A protein has these predicted regions:
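Conserved N-terminal helical subregion
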Residues: 3-4, 76-180, 188-193
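Conserved Rossmann-like nucleotide-cofactor binding loop
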Residues: 16, 39, 174
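Glycine-rich FAD pyrophosphate-binding loop
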Residues: 25-52
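N-terminal FAD cofactor-binding segment of flavoenzymes
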Residues: 51-93
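Conserved FAD-binding catalytic core of PHBH/FMO-like flavoproteins
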Residues: 67, 151-273
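FAD/FMN-dependent oxidoreductases across multiple families
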Residues: 242-334
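C-terminal helical "tail/cap" subdomain of flavin- and related membrane-associated enzymes
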Residues: 321-400
């Protein structure tokens, strides 16, 4: 057991925690990452159906630019496992409403890139290991935490005590650090789970995403780097998700194809499936003393727009910019003014996206015929109006 002093401690070494550390590295401050899980093994390998990570993220062009600035994107590019997509088709399964987005609507090369979560994590780990002022402590749980006037003191499962000038909570939606800091949240349960898997399709996906809004919840088909493989995210009410996670292979494939109703490619084969609960949670405050929240620890949303990880990366970039700016000018880089600027910039965007997801959930979950009619008219109207369509595309790819 020992006492360790660092400038900045980050609890949680997932994508957002690692990106936050890298965004702060230019300060030269001593930054230590702590994660309860063992260090992940090498990123995904192989191209067979079950070799692909079932958890993927739809990284926007803005997130990709940020990862490039952290020297983390090159490993993803070299792996040739990122699936860039240029088109997105969204439709209402209960009517005729649909929107077709294309990259040309924004005069860009692609709307984003589908990347396995484990690959993004591995790329960021490699980047942190190349930075002399970053250290990572894997398999180290947070046990207790005290927020003091000039520091944050916490103990870990190894028995060590860490004293940090500031601490960042990046440990996910069920954040232990947020709980120990006594920070309040507002939480909504959707009563749904998401089933994720990799599927083989025919014909090839042609670098397009498909999203069907079903009465039971949205189904997304996301193109992977191999042109005959897609990742699925199927959000279903609790009882239905329990049924479909246990369904045999052929029944599940048939269920997917019925849900897609011929709008997307035909699903031929499905990998092993995983399921996780859907919860929306938002911290009332993003900081308390010298403790700050980022990513899902501050806000977690429904995955239907694929924006969760992009919002978290925006948190990491904004907090990093504010601290680096203050440090370069010799100001107090862990002052309430710095943290307040971060919160002010990020809270509005995060709340706006959460409200949009809640509206989509209500609008497409309603069985009221009048609501069904209005949403179909709305979808078709947006598809026919270039300015409105451009705005929706900008929201989908996180463009300003």
């Amino acid at each position: 057991m020992q006492e360790r002093q660092v400038d900045i401690a980050i609890i949680g070494a997932g994508v957002v925690g690692l990106a936050t550390a890298l965004s702060l590295a230019p300060t030269g401050l001593q930054i230590a990452l702590f994660d309860a899980q063992p260090k992940p093994s090498a990123g995904p390998q192989g191209t067979a159906l079950n070799d692909w990570d079932r958890r993927v993220t739809a990284l926007t062009p803005e997130s990709i630019r940020f990862l490039k600035s952290l020297a983390a994107w090159s490993l993803i590019e070299e792996s040739k496992r990122g699936g860039a997509y240029t088109d997105m088709l969204v439709w209402d399964s209960e009517g005729t409403g649909q929107i077709h987005f294309t990259a040309t609507d924004l005069n860009i090369d692609s709307l984003g890139t589908i990347v396995e979560s484990s690959l993004t994590t591995q790329a960021l780990i490699s980047a942190t290991e190349a930075s002399s002022n970053l250290s990572s402590h894997w398999g180290t749980r947070l046990e207790s935490m005290d927020i003091e006037a000039e520091s944050v003191r916490f103990t870990t499962s190894s028995g060590d005590t860490v004293i940090a000038d500031m601490t960042i909570g990046a440990d996910g939606g069920r954040s232990k650090s947020r709980e120990l800091a006594g920070m309040r949240t507002r939480e909504w349960r959707y009563g749904q789970n998401a089933i994720v898997a990799t599927v083989r399709v025919q014909p090839h996906h042609s670098h397009a995403c498909w999203q069907a809004f079903l009465p039971t919840g949205p189904l997304a088909l996301l193109p992977l780097a191999n042109d005959d493989l897609c990742s699925i995210v199927w959000s279903l009410d609790d009882a239905l998700s329990d049924h479909w996670i246990q369904a045999d292979h052929d029944a599940f494939v048939a269920g997917l194809n019925r849900a897609l109703s011929g709008r997307g490619p035909q699903v031929l084969e499905v990998s092993e499936r995983q399921m996780f609960p859907l919860i929306q949670c938002h911290a009332v405050d993003y900081y308390h003393g010298r403790f700050v929240l980022v990513g899902d620890a501050a806000h977690s949303i429904h995955p239907l727009a694929g924006q969760g990880i992009n919002l978290g990366l925006s948190d990491a970039q904004t907090l990093g910019n504010e601290i680096v700016w203050a440090h370069q000018r010799g100001a107090d880089w862990c002052s309430p003014q710095v943290f307040s600027r971060y919160e002010r910039q990020r809270k509005g965007d995060n709340l706006g996206m959460m409200a949009t997801m809640q509206a989509f959930k209500w609008g497409f979950g309603s069985k009221n015929p009048a609501v069904t009619l209005m949403r179909n008219i709305g979808l078709n109207s947006v598809d026919a109006l270039p300015m409105a369509k451009r705005w929706f595309v900008q929201q989908a790819v996180g463009a300003k």
